[in-house]
């Protein structure tokens, strides 16, 4: 069950935070010759995520935000894209795996393997993979990429 407070907090952090950040940056970006906004979404926005409805809903909304901003800001020379990380190594996914394993009554290692088995490449993404893609999109090499939602997930098909 999802409380109204949980819903509002997730929307405020995940969606509104990116909107307000972008809106504050736009006046400065309009003065740049290489302006780019990279929104961070998630593959959960495209696939859905059981028991994480507020999270998945806001990540889907970020995809729409990025696409709409790309259309609106393109004439000013500002590129906008969304990155959709999959299962990213680190403390956050470790907690998700641990909590889920406890709920299901299985070991952490068994639950982690279930997550990894959902990825075609059979490995998690690391934060540097996401950072590298963001740097590419912000670089001159990414000058003609806008309005795109780019998955960095090793081909996750279900969460």
Label the model's feature ranges.
Residues 42:
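Residue(s) in the substrate-gating loop at a strand-loop-helix junction
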Residues 22, 58, 66:
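Active-site helix of classical SDR
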Residues 27, 71-72, 143:
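Alpha-helical segment proximal to the catalytic Tyr-Lys
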Residues 74, 79, 145-147:
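Short, small/polar-rich loop/turn modules that mediate ligand/substrate recognition or access, typified
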Residues 46-47, 123, 134-135, 146-159:
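Short C-terminal tail/terminal secondary-structure segment
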Residues 3-11, 115-116:
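Substrate-binding pocket helix/loop in short-chain dehydrogenase/reductase
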Residues 2, 48-56, 68, 96:
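Active-site loop-to-helix junction immediately N-terminal to the catalytic Tyr of the SDR YXXXK motif
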């Amino acid at each position: 069950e999802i409380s109204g407070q949980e819903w509002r907090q997730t929307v405020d952090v995940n969606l509104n935070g990116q909107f307000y950040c972008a809106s504050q940056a736009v006046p400065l970006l309009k003065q740049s010759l290489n302006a780019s906004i990279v929104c961070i979404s998630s593959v959960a926005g495209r696939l859905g995520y059981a028991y994480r409805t507020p999270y998945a809903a806001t990540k889907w909304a970020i995809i729409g935000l990025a696409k709409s901003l790309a259309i609106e800001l393109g004439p000013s020379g500002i590129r906008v894209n969304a990155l959709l990380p999959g299962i990213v190594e680190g403390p956050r996914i470790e907690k998700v795996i641990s909590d889920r394993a406890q709920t299901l009554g299985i070991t952490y290692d068994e639950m982690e393997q279930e997550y990894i088995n959902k990825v075609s490449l059979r490995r998690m993404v690391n934060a540097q993979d996401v950072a590298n893609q963001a740097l590419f999109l912000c670089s001159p090499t990414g000058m003609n990429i806008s309005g795109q939602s780019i998955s960095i997930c090793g081909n996750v098909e279900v969460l």
